[in-house]
Amino acid sequence: MFHKFISTLTNKKITQTIMGTINKENIKPAMLLSAFGDACGYKNGIWEFEKSPSRIYEHYEYLGGYKNLKINKKDWRLSDDTIMHIATAIAITRPTNTDNESICKELAKAYIHSMEDMAGRAPGIQTINSVSLMTQTGMRSKVYQWNEIDFSDRAGGCGGSMRSMCIGFKYWSDEQLDTLIELSIESGRITHNNPVGFLGALVSALFASYAIRSIPPKTWPLKLMTEVMPKAREYLEKTSNSSNRNIENYEKGWNYFWNSWKSYLKLRQIPSNPDELKAANDKGIDYPVFPKDYSDYKVRENFYHSISFSGWGGSSGHDSCIIAYDALLGSADNWEEMIKRSVLHGGDNDSTGAIGCCWWGALYGFNGVPECNYEKIEYKSIIEGLAKEISN
């Protein structure tokens, strides 16, 4: 299904408009390195479901390190993360899109079609259940529309955050912020109707939009907490109803997501409001601040575990983005370090890898990345074609 959506439009390196500057050349690396992070973390199910980081590191070293990770369909197939990220990219680039609702309908269709290619890719239960409700079958009396999935306390997983990054590449400017907020939230809420889940989709897309503009990563949370979260709240109130999207049902999840980010930012001494920014500048704090022993993967593993909802770091909407962001901050432009921090851990590492490596690619392109990491990756031509479409 994917090939028919691909065009042959030419990508341009830098585009300057009245809306600002975007490094379009890095959309392709971002999309491909996201797929790398997914395929590497998944490792055909071997690494994603390995809870021991020591065993993952032993296997990684046995393979010869990142310069010898020859990603290919047989040994490193893509998981559900990238298949659904591809689906998101297809939906937002459809020529028939006229408004946000039409795009949301396309998102639902694309997610339904993506289920045809999920054998051996370990899709999440919440995604499977939601998509099945939107799928026409002979025995189903009601087929749910894209905005009819019920609210659930159990829908806070990372299924939304792992697939929304490309929305930030399509709607990257300040003038498009409202569209980014609405579409990223809905891209997650289509299957994960819980703030912990769909706000993760918002952060993934938002930070991608910052990365593709080369906005310094340490400034992202201030913009998230002061500019974007209030707008997201307004949108949820505007779309609230008395049934499946009641704002009152969202309070617990909203607060959990907000407090999780506040706690993380306090830990790293990253400002989350103007007063904290002024205080940090007055005190000369060089943030983010990491523990001295944070280069030890065991120390990172304990932290990833501590912020998770269920003990599996990165499996929810909040911690998938926090871990990916933490890895990005700690790695700077070092590709190997990004792999170690975002992918090589005992949690939901294909999702944190897909998100974090996407942001990294948007910032740094293929700088220092061995070609073997992506040259034979599954669906490479499709991903490249969609990157061109998004750049258009």
Curated annotation (Swiss-Prot):
Q: Tell me which residues bind substrate.
A: K109, G159
| Biological-process GO terms, alphabetical | protein modification process
Which Gene3D superfamilies does this one have? ADP-ribosylation/Crystallin J1 (1.10.4080.10)
- Where Mg(2+) 2 is bound, by residue? D348, D350, S351
- List the catalysed reactions: N(omega)-(ADP-D-ribosyl)-L-arginyl-[protein] + H2O = ADP-D-ribose + L-arginyl-[protein]
Annotated region (Substrate) at: 125-127, 192-194, 309-311, 315-316
Cite the binding residues for Mg(2+) 1. Answer: S79, D80, D81, D350
On whether Metal-binding is a keyword of this UniProt record, the answer is yes
Q: Which UniProt keywords apply?
A: Hydrolase, Magnesium, Metal-binding
Q: Tell me the cofactors it needs.
A: Mg(2+)
* Keyword Hydrolase among record annotations: yes
Annotated InterPro entries: ADP-ribosylglycohydrolase, Ribosyl_crysJ1, Ribosyl_crysJ1_sf
- Per UniProt, what is one Pfam family of this protein? ADP_ribosyl_GH
Class of enzymatic activity (EC top level): hydrolase
What quaternary arrangement does the UniProt entry report?
Monomer.
Described by its record, this protein's role is as follows: Specifically acts as an arginine mono-ADP-ribosylhydrolase by mediating the removal of mono-ADP-ribose attached to arginine residues on proteins.
Query: What family classification does the UniProt entry report for this protein?
Result: Belongs to the ADP-ribosylglycohydrolase family.
What's this protein's name?
A: ADP-ribosylhydrolase ARH1
Gene for this chain: adprh
